[in-house]
Amino acid sequence: MEKGNKNHFVLVHGACHGAWCWYKVVTILRSEGHKVSVLDMAASGINPKHVEDLNSMADYNEPLMEFMNSLPQQERVVLVGHSMGGINISLAMEKFPHKIVVAVFVTAFMPGPDLNFVALSQQYNQQVESHMDTEFVYNNGLEKCPTSLVFGPKVLATNFYQLSPPEDLTLATYLVRPVPLFDESILLTNTTLSKEKYGCVRRVYVVCDKDNVLKEEQFQRWLINNNPPNEVHMIHDADHMVMFSKPREFSSCLVMISQKYH
């Protein structure tokens, strides 16, 4: 990997995962001398909260917001969101634009001032062919929308980890936790992104061409066209879990992005 300026990377996981999913990338980046912070969102990884405790995106995103708030005023980070983590980092961009060097969306949801969370959810659902063994929980009754979900071994193997080492898939089957699902009214509460704040942060999108979860043409390219970032990178032969299937290529990509926008 190219030597040069050292950066502080903040890595945010996607749905049902946790800080644990970054272990390969963290090791590579730290070996290059970079500072890396990895966070568990609420009710994720080893965070002590339970999914039933979460009533809004703000509740789920609290660990990231607290972390960003705790940074010294002069410190700026490279904020990286994977999959659903793109929503988390978007909310942080709106509140802390001055603390972010560049935001990197890794085969991720990328809302914007003219593309709200509900529109993303609808587009995502249109490209889902089967939920397979994903388990949905209906704490408000079967006649209402599900309140959480957790991915099962089959959908993880087929759609998330199909090009990743089998031991990483095994790890995931033991460590995934339910992620909260919110109805449209909650999704639209306190989640507005402005051109003045969110819009002033430079954005890079990393496309994974073999992603079976957020498919390249049906979702990733749709996002890029509807909310154009400053730059787009492609990692070839990467499944949804690029940090497992292509950890070195992905880490090199992050360093290259960070040095360009430093």
Where are each of the predicted segments found?
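Conserved HGGG/HGGXW glycine-rich cap/lid loop of the alpha/beta-hydrolase fold
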Residues: 2-48, 66-70, 74-75
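Active-site loop/oxyanion-hole signature of alpha/beta-hydrolase fold enzymes
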Residues: 35-37, 41-78, 91-99, 117-126
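Gly/Ala-rich beta-loop-alpha elbow adjacent to hydrolase catalytic centers
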Residues: 80-85, 89
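Flexible "cap/lid" loop of the alpha/beta hydrolase fold
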Residues: 94-145, 183-187
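Conserved serine/cysteine hydrolase catalytic core
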Residues: 165-170, 174-243, 261
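Post-His helix in hydrolase/transferase enzymes
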Residues: 243-259
